[in-house]
């Protein structure tokens, strides 16, 4: 499965390097919407994912873990948004996919910003209850992985230090001097820009540039075409000391921990599925996920290879 696709949420960038590399479509059999089965005679499972690097990696790791246990795996990775994924679950196109607790809370449950739980435990509790109690298509959100992938407001470390910007309060006070590189979904989602401005009312950027490719947002920072950008805390790019995530001291966002959402009917037929999925998620943490994302986005390694190497080293699958 080749990593050669422009990814809406997590395009890659070599900071200080040659910029964005060329991109073509992912191989259909490996990562597209209609990936074929693995050819096993075991129980069937269809694994989906959304359309960015971390999601595709998580989906690929789930797929490889199931294949290692003898399942006949169909990959339907890179499908679309959380709404697309939720519909795919409900109509039986997929059996499971990785979601984020906070994303489900905001986008699937439709909860407003003022109701966001302040703890991951409460976020997960409410989301898991919602999925379990669905009348037509009961599902389970399983135990989350032990890391969060939240929004990250990012600046060049040099710029932030020169302007004494460490927190979003600091940023808001000086925002009229700064250009913000955002993306359409963040500007429109209830947990996005309006939520940030509500909690930090002095926020008033000199200019907001809408850039829907994450890699180009990082490129804009590197080339001083923007002063502030919106990223995600497990982006591979953030391993660079040249970048600084500005602290959110008011905890304005829900908790975004990845966890599999699985059809109850699939779990009923395959009681070992929970253990398989949990073995993948518990092999991860924020540093490991950031490293894996970076291997795909920055080093241009294949999804399959990155997933396999990690799972073998973690003892999740046999080498």
What is each of the regions a protein language model found here?
Residues 1-11, 16-29:
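N-terminal secretory signal peptides
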Residues 56-58, 73-88, 93-100:
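Extracytoplasmic small-molecule ligand-binding "clamshell" domains
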Residues 41-54, 72-76, 176-182:
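Short, well-ordered beta-strand elements
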Residues 102-194, 198, 202-212, 227, ...:
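Contiguous mixed-secondary-structure segments that line small-molecule binding/active-site clefts
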Residues 28-41:
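Bacterial lipoprotein signal-peptidase II cleavage site
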